[in-house]
Amino acid sequence: MVRPPSARSAVPGVGRLGLLDPTAAASLRELGWDNVESIPVLWALSRAPDADLALNTLMRLREALGSDWQRLDSAIRTDTSLRGRLFALLGSSTALGDHLVAEPAAWEVLRRGDLPDRDELLADLLAAVQATPEAGPHAGPMLFRAGIAGPEAVALLRCRYRDQLMLLAALDLAATVENEPVLPYRVVGRHLTDLADAALTAALAVAVARVCKDQPCPVRLAVIAMGKCGARELNYVSDVDVVFVAEPADATATRLAAEMMSVGSQAFFEVDAALRPEGKQGALVRTLDSHLTYYKRWARTWEFQALLKNRPMTGDLELGREYRDAVMPMVWTASERPDFVPEVQGMRRRVEDLVPAELRERELKLGRGSLRDVEFAVQLLQLVHGRVDENLHVASTVDALSALAAGGYVGRDDAANLTASYEFLRLLEHRLQLQRLKRTHTLPADDDEEGMRWLARAAHIRPDGRQDAMGVLRSEIRRNAVRVRRLHAKLFYRPLLEAVVRMDPDALRLSPDAAVRQLAALGYAAPENAFGHLKALTGGVSRKGRIQALLLPTLLEWLGETPNPDAGLLAYRRVSEALDEQTWFLRELRDEGAVAQRLMIVLGSSEFLPDLLINAPETIRMFADGPHGPLLLGPQPEEVARGILTAAARYDDPNRAVAAARSLRRHELARVASADLLGMLEVPQVCRALSSVWVAVLDAALAAVIRAGEAESGEPAPAAFAVIGMGRLGGMELGYGSDADVLFVCEPRPGVDETKAVKWANTVAERVQRLLGAPSTDPPLHVDAGLRPEGRSGALVRTLSAYQAYYGQWAQSWEVQALLRAHQVAGDQELGVRFLHAVDKVRYPAGGVSEDAVREIRRIKARVDSERLPRGADPATHTKLGRGGLADIEWTVQLLQLRHAHEVESLHNTATLETLAAIEKAELLAAEDVALLRDSWLLATKARNALVLVRGKPSDQLPGPGRLLSAVATVAGWPNNDGGSEFLDHYLRITRRARAVVERVFGS
């Protein structure tokens, strides 16, 4: 038989309550809480951050209260809110628990369910020493004289201060025990500041009574709060930094200041005046003029950073306001000082270095991802931008973050995340300090599970279903530290800052004279035109305009270092206007320094890329760095090719299929060209990527046309169709300005008439050429079949057998040579490979080509050298047909292939560089000669690609020294400060040596 639970068994035992102290059960009996009526009290006690500590302190409080315990016990049982405040307080703070035991009647303070306002705090602290308003010539609203000024004054003030601190802590902690409102961090910080102001006003009242005796106060003394107190974001336990201003700054003023500090430090907290001019070596009290003289002549940068948070606190508030009004203009111009940013950043690093390595991960204030990271970053941004934006003239860190976000200086999400992390870390700091009312910022050690568990409960951290409260706390600490460090790096060290502070103050406002002057200094040839672009970019009062105004000083300087800043700024305006609706664009430029700088390099160097980027804007986001390096290097050509084929295959309409393929080609072209221009890719990588995307688009177009034809006729294609790449396409060595040289080959399906098959294939080839060559927003794709048998007079498409017959009977030497580059690139793979096998007999003949063929090739080469060079071209600097240019190297390689491929199988290769490697391995040329040919081919290809990137259109001729050559040299990766002359000398030297090798091969 199951017995019903008894009344006694319904009462939770100490184990269920989480009480570990061996005396806990006896203590509960002694309190009279081991019964059914006390169950709500017991469960509330169990929720205290440290239930054992709370119970032990309650036992001491019961003893201290004596017969008055019954009143408190009754209140605990009936007033849920009071119970929550009391248990949370006693389970969180041994120091405030000790205070309550020492002053047991003070529990009545906890009956109050709201915070006293600033005036109530002031009245309460002043009443403790019976202070009254000071009379006399220097009377003011914050100057009082204590009626109690003897040694007992300190004890009275300490007790009253602790009462108020206890009430705040109880209200702050109550939500951990009962369902009470959570006090926002900013409310706690402001209340602690109001309490500190009231406390030091009372301390000053005692000082006036002690120093001035029966005489009216003979001086004006202003107490200026600095640091966290000045910013109204004080901790529970914190030094209060002050500066004193007096008129006159005589012995009486000094004694008043010293006495106030002494009383305050004994009764409340450490009062520190070390931020005064000259620090602890300087005079404790100065006149306003003395302060200003020091700040104008001697102050260091960090002192202006400290002044950012100054606030008249007590004493002569009018004098305090005069001080603030006089020093703040100097604060907002501090960023104009030489080396301002490096000095501030260096100071932050030095502070970080002071933290012992073993404590850096536990240090909330000074370690990595700590409170100081946030504060330094925010203060630096305020000082840099506050000189032209009064909205940033705020003192508290959280308010400053809000203002920075509202002004567009930081991202709204970044500001929100940083604020959340900052408030979380400050919450932990508050809880740690409350424990013993000690100034600490260090988290418990990892192996201190008891300490971490207490902190989790005190911070109101709850289990999340996967981890207990302690595990959640550890995860949150790590997550917030990483987030702070990441955002700190974006804000504090981002390269925008140093550039912005080097600009004239007017330049940030972009006033006409300042902007034109600055633009000319930065290398703009037409600064007035450039200024017009700036006005267009920053016009209006929109958030985008403000962000542009923030970015432009840095962007202009980066553009000024490019070959053509004027064109770059125009391009930037075009890109900005085209992406006006893309909210990510300006955010990326502002928050990712690499994106902004790389974009400026690209726009100021290339006429090829701006249109591509406007039509493929997502490429700009790839200018950022990822975890494994630049995002531009992420996609692989094979992946891009598969994506193009997949995208095109989704459409039945060839026009839409080709449009999809060309769109992806546009993105890939923008990516490759950007990475190339930024020096991230080597020449072979560029050529392979460009060739791969060309092949994919060609293959996609061919498949779409065939698919549409089959759908239209309702029958399978009457022939297999293959595209053979020739020239640079066959060698997978395309440049930006290269056409695609191809041959079209078909083979009728079984039972299909050849005439019908060829006619169909011609229709397919013509449509592919037409689709790919149609005008579009990306560079056109010219498919050139001019290398086919009989040239442009011959049939556009032939069957495989027709090709075999022609090459077997009629092939001329130049056609044989052209076949050395033949490679299957699109269409029917099996047919393409059969074509290659068929022409192998022609291009790699047994015994090599005849001497007559060699002589014919030499004759044609000589004619090309003399006749094909365009009129007016310089044979020394024409990258394709000039001396030591691409044609020279490729003809040399091909001649060696024709003569030796029958015996050296590795020469059966369509790629120039790979064939050169085979030539070297077979010792057909000396390694030194091969190196010269390779270097010349790479340099000529690089220069030819650079010409297209710079000019925006195909070109083979290097210009003479000047701005254009300088741009080509820069894009080609050549250090350049001489109009490109050094690059040109290098080009001539390399190609001249290669030409000597070419002449030896063709002369042998």
From Swiss-Prot:
GO MF terms held by the record: [glutamate-ammonia-ligase] adenylyltransferase activity; [glutamine synthetase]-adenylyl-L-tyrosine phosphorylase activity; ATP binding; magnesium ion binding
Region described as Adenylyl removase: 1-496
SUPFAM superfamilies given in the database record: Nucleotidyltransferase (SSF81301), Nucleotidyltransferase substrate binding subunit/domain (SSF81593)
E.C. no: 2.7.7.89, 2.7.7.42
Keyword line: ATP-binding, Magnesium, Multifunctional enzyme, Nucleotide-binding, Nucleotidyltransferase, Transferase
Pfam family, one: GlnD_UR_UTase
Catalytic reactions on record: [glutamine synthetase]-O(4)-(5'-adenylyl)-L-tyrosine + phosphate = [glutamine synthetase]-L-tyrosine + ADP; [glutamine synthetase]-L-tyrosine + ATP = [glutamine synthetase]-O(4)-(5'-adenylyl)-L-tyrosine + diphosphate
InterPro entries listed in its UniProt record: GlnE, GlnE_rpt_dom, NT_sf, PII_UdlTrfase/GS_AdlTrfase
Domain of life: Bacteria
CDD domains recorded: NT_GlnE_GlnD_like (cd05401)
Cellular component aspect of the GO annotation: cytosol
Needed cofactors: Mg(2+)
GO biological process, one term: regulation of glutamine family amino acid metabolic process
Primary role: Involved in the regulation of glutamine synthetase GlnA, a key enzyme in the process to assimilate ammonia. When cellular nitrogen levels are high, the C-terminal adenylyl transferase (AT) inactivates GlnA by covalent transfer of an adenylyl group from ATP to specific tyrosine residue of GlnA, thus reducing its activity. Conversely, when nitrogen levels are low, the N-terminal adenylyl removase (AR) activates GlnA by removing the adenylyl group by phosphorolysis, increasing its activity.
Family affiliation: Belongs to the GlnE family.
NCBIfam families, per the entry: PRK14109.1
Stated name of the protein: Bifunctional glutamine synthetase adenylyltransferase/adenylyl-removing enzyme
